[in-house]
Each structure stands twice: as C-alpha cells, then as structure tokens.
Amino acid sequence: MKNRKMLSILGMMFILCSAISCKGDDKPGTGVNPADRDTAPGEPISIVDGKVRFYIDIDTDAARVKAGVAASDLLSAASSVYVNGTKYDVASDESGNLYIDALANAQGTYTASLAFEDGTKWFGTSPTINLAVPASQFASDGAMKLLPMFADYSEATGNKLFMKDAVGILSLHIGGSAKIASVKLQKEGSDMAGLFLKTKEGLESSDTTANFVTLNCTNGGEFVSAGSDFNMMLRPGNYSGAELVICTDDNRVMRTSLDVDVKANGFEAKNIDFKADDNVLWYDGFDLCTWGGNIMGGSQAAGMSPSSAAVTSTGAASGADRLGTDYALSAVAYNVPGCGFIQNNWNNASGKTVGDAHDMSDSYVISRNLTGYTYLFRSQEFQGVMGVSYGTTARGIIATPRFTAINGFRNVKIVVRFCPNAGFDDLLLFSVIDGGMITSASLDGKALPEDLIEYVANSANTRLLNDRLSIPASMATPQEWHTLELNVKNATNSTYLWFAGESVTTGNHCFFVDSIEVTDLGESFKKSGLRVLYWNIQDGMWSDQPNQYKNFIEWVKSYDPDVCVWCEAASIYKDYSTVSAPEAERYLPNGWPEIAKKYGHEYSALGGHRDNFPQEITSKYPITTLLKITDTDQAGKPVSHGAAIQQLDVKGRKINIVTLHMWPQAYGYGVPKAQQDASKANNEGDKYREFEMKYIVDHTVNAPEYASHTDWLMMGDFNSRSMVDEWYYKYADTKPTYYLCQNVIKDNTNLVDIIGNFYPGCFVSSTGGKSRIDYMYASASMYSKVKNAITIIDTYTVPVKDAKYNSGFYFPSDHRPILVDFEL
C-alpha cells in the first residue's frame, strides 16, 4: 500500500447543509404530498413541499454495463440513493420506475450516489464522499453489482439521474487454452486501488492505497478458462508501462508490460494471448495473497483486509473463518497478517498436502490456489507475501508442490526472494527434495561456498548462515528482498523445494517470501548406449497388482531400459492385503514374459528361486542363465533369496549380470524366535550376509570357470551398508559389522560401486528412509563405460507408506530404482 499523511477516508464524515429551494419550477408550500405528485421520468425537476423527485436510471455508457452487467440487475439491487450527503431509500412508482424524493438545494446542485444491497462497506459513512476500490477483486461480476455509482443533476437530463461509474474498467480478453488462477496489474508509484475521497475532480487518495489490482480467478477451484473476458475496476489514471502478471492453475506465468489509460466511467478493452514465460516451469508470486499489511513497506505502509480487527496466529481471532472470497475493504496496519496459520497442527499436517490438511477454511485454501503445497506450516498471508513463523517462537515450514511440469531429468534454476524477520536468530535451510542435486548456489548474485551445499538421502541442502543475511533491526522501516538462486541437476517431476529455519528449538525463525520460480535449463542427460534398470519392487509390485501392473508397465516404458533386474519378483499376497494368495492366484514370476513384452522386452529369465523373493531379469537382448544359486556347500545355510549369473548377448558382446537379494534380518538365518534377540545382539544377521556374499563372489566373479569373462555387473538388494558411506554413517567404530557384507566385495573383487563413485561426497539413499542398501556394481571394463547413473526419484517411485489398507507396505515400493547407461 502506498502511504500518504492524510486522514483515513472511511473514518471521515462531512456535514452537508441542505436547503429548501432550487432552480426550476418553484412551487413551495402547495401542500401536495410528494408521493402523489403527477410527474414522469425525464421532465424538468420541480419542488413539492421542499422536495425534488429524481428518477434513478443507469447510464447506457456506464463502464460496468459495457463490462456485461445488466442495467436491470443493478436497478433491482438498488437500495438507497445519497443526494448531497443525505440518504434516501429507493421507492418504485406504479410503472416500476425507481425514484427518491430529495430535499431541494438552494444552489440547485445535486450530487448523487447509488448504493446497493450490502453496499455500505464500500463507502463507510457516505458514498458521496468515500469510496473503497479493492486491490483484491474476483473474476465474477459480484463487485460490479456492489460498488456505488454516481450522477450529477443537469438540466439536460431533468429529473432523471443517470448513474455512472467513478472508476474505470480494464477488460482483458485473454486468449489461449489455459485455466487462469490470477490476473495482476501493477504500476509502481501509482494509486490503482484503495480508499479514496470522492471529489468533483475524481478520486483523491488516502493513506491506504495500493499500486496493484489482482483479479482472483480461482472460482471455487474450477478456475476461469482463457478465452474469457477478465474485468478489473481501477481508479482512473494513466498506467502506461504497467506490469501484467497472469498465473494459471498449474503455476505457469506470463509477465508482460501493458499500457493502460482508464478514465472515470471508462471501459478499456485489450486482447492478450496467454503464452507462458519461456522455460518457466513453476512460479508463485503469491499474487492471490492480497490481505493484510504491507509488511515490507514499514510502519508508514498499510494494507486492506475483510476486517480491521487484528489477526492472531491461532484462536478465536485467527481469521480461520475467513472464506478467502471476502472483499478486503478495511484498512489495517503494515504488520497485521491477513489470515491465521494455514497449518498449525503438525500431527495433522505431516505427510499430507495443504489441500488435505489445513486450519484455515477449505474455501480460503482453494481461493489462494494453495492446495498442492506440501507444507504451509505456521504460514500466513500478508499483502503479496507469505509469512512463516510470524508472531510465534515455534518453527514454521514452507514446502512447494512437486514440480510436475518437469519431464525426465532436467537441470533447473530455483530462485527464491525472501527476507528474514527483524531479530531472526536462526539459519535458513533450503532443501531440494525428492529429485535433484544442487550444483551451485548464490545469494544476491554472490556465489556461496561449496561447503554450504550437501546431499543426504533424498535431499539437496543449502544453509544460509546469519552472517550472510541482512537481519532487519525492525520491520517498521522498509526492507529489501534477498535473492537466492539454486542450480539443480537431475530434477524430476517429484522434486519440490522445502525451506525453514534449521533449528526446532524456541527462537525467532520468522521470514517472509515474495516469490518462488523454477526455470528449465535443459536436459540433464539423455539415454546413451545400454540402459540397465534395477529395482526392488516389493512383493511382486503388490501396489499395482490389482491394476494388472498397468502403471508399472507405463513407468518402465517411460525410461526405455534395455535390461531390467527386479528383486522381490514374485507375487505373494492377495490384492491390497497381507493375506497370502493361493499358488494358483500368484501371477508372478510365471507372468514375467507377458509383462516384459508389454514394455518391449522379448527375453526374460528367473534367478535362483527358493522362496518368495527371487530376482527376474528381462531384456531386449538374448539372455543365457549360466548359474542359479539357492543352496551353499553348508547344510542349512542357503543363499536366502537366491542368486544367479545371467549372461546378456549385446550385439555379440557378452555381459554377465549377477543378481542377488541378501538376508534381510538383524538376526541370523534360521534362528528360532526365542533366540532372535540374542542373535541380533551378536550381529548374526550381518555375519550371515557376509557368509552369503562370500559364497556368491566365490562362485561368480571370482570363480575359475569364469576367469576369462571380463564384463560383469552385480546388482540387487544387499541389505547392508558400505564403507563408501562411512563419512555419513560413522559406524566403523560403533557398528563395524554393518559393513561386513560390502567389505567382501571391497576386499576380494575389483567391482566398483557405481552410484557411490559417481556421486562422491553425496549420500544417496536407495530406500524411503536414510539407507543405501541397493547397489549396482561394475567391473573395471564396464565402469569405464558408465555414461549416466542415477537413483531414480519421480512421482511414481516416491515411497509412500500404505495408510489405506494397513498393510505396512509402501506404494509402489520401499526401495528406489537405480538406472545406469553404458556406452559400449
């Protein structure tokens, strides 16, 4: 809101004097009841017992009529007319004409304003002198049926007052096929909306004005389709070079400049074809957040809300009952939020989107297009801004929706404009989650040190320490925005941005966010050479079993692998149940040839199958099974889930793939239940995995009969941790047996951990938690051919714990896939 040292208009009252004479045919004192006078619309005015009858009509050239509001609708909603400051209720004659009988004026001047039902909030004491033009408007024409209209008496029109608009209307015809969420027009230094004094010269500004108008087009979640006319009411003025920002339901944005010159009662129509800004994948400038104070403008700034009452974070005064569709017509101070905390109960919000869990009303959340946000915890709107942790010493969180517009693996730039609150005493943690690694970061154009960037599990993190931020001494003085830029590689359609103060203890964690923008910088990588895909698909892809594996098949096709290895490749349970299915109902593993053909693989083979968790390999190239492993040379000590050597013939090149799935428990194999705790304490699960791995290595990559074979891959669910990740785990001194299984490979083979070596210094979890237990190893000859390698995180593979069927399983799996391209 722009500031001026003037009185607030809505609190102002004018004392207007009335007289009993006027120009025209003077007939005072005749004793005729004004209601019985014999007069018709359009005649010269006449005075009967000190009153003048005026008929009320709508000017056919009124701006809102040109905008499509029917004059008959306006007249039917007419409630009262103010003439020279005095209110008169509207009456109707026998012909249905609306009229009032107003006190005659000695000077013969009559300034009138027409008020509509429920319209008093638009002008306070009198529409003749006050007018509120909201900065937040709606795509429906509701406001155009409520904002007062005005007329001045003239001899030319006689006793008819033709009501016009004091505002101008900009009508934008937005072409295209998008669904529009908001249209914002802004001109720095202007008074486009706010509270005004109505004078003969026009609308005079108060100390509560705005340099923008935002048209809310959310329409109850249906939005407004392009191809429509979008009308906004503006204070008359020249707004050449104004910025026009159009946002869609899926957070695409178009920004352009527009020359606008609207006159009082003027109607200016312009055509705009919606074309999203090049390469912008996702944007939120919080244009739909229009309520509350201008927190960045300082104490001399103001704002507007549906009520002038203070808003608290929680409780009865939190504004939680606000619907989001109310008109903001009351002035509020710069530091007053426009709503309560959008989310305030972590137990309710955790793991859900804002659309699923919120403390504000459903209508409010929809009206701000916030339903897709991952978190807006302890967040609330100010004017054009989202405030986090305001008015509380507890930490708040903002987390965007997933950037679903990303297709494949992309390099992106994420830009955040933010400002810490006065007295901020935390550090800010920005995390790119579920896809993508931060390659570089800058703050206000200055590069941040690499040691402030890390990757852990599924989260790429950047920390901003206090000494790098400008912490305001007080928000009562105007503030500037910081700009953080994050360059990210391998972002996917599941990627989202999470940020908050890092500490969870009591403190000043508050910050404000102006905008978030994600820009596409191009593909991270394309398929190159032989593409190998591995995944533990949890119980034979239990999650997609009732759907005949259609989603799974489409997902595989999207990556176009040449070879697939699936762990837990057998059906076990009935649909969405933990009840074991009869053997006759178990589609897998026998059904793999049929499934594989649906995603383009002609060949398939099953590994050592001794229980419910075998491995299956499928391929575009011929497969020869060289060895199946189930038992070992020690009785009662099998390779628990089997293993195999599957040989591919890739255009004449023979590649051996060892598939395996190691013992999963902390206790040893075959240990009776009563002894399992003791077995765990003795780390017998780790020792059994070590035993299995020694047997597999001795009979595959180190077996004399395969000494001439040079091209090897080994992959599967190893259920064990690697010394490559010791920098993160730090188990060497406290839990050294965790590394026994992987140490067999490290100490006895030349196999290379592809993911571990491709991303040094990064801890890349292969599960939904913080564990890297799935690996793809390569011989030196194969590792030298690695072109691309990634642990896939996308919208399909993000592990989500089953909350519907109480199975304890995940959708689609509790593991993440690994994808590697080899340039052979």
Language-model segments: what does each one mean?
Residues S440-A491:
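Extracellular carbohydrate recognition and processing domains
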Residues T393-R395, E502-T519:
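Extracellular carbohydrate recognition
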Residues E523-S524, N702-L713, S720-L824:
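Metal-dependent phosphoester-hydrolase catalytic domains
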Residues D277-M360:
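Extracellular carbohydrate-recognition regions
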Residues V133-M149, T325-I406:
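Surface-exposed, low-complexity/disordered Ser/Thr/Gly/Pro/Asn-rich loops and linkers
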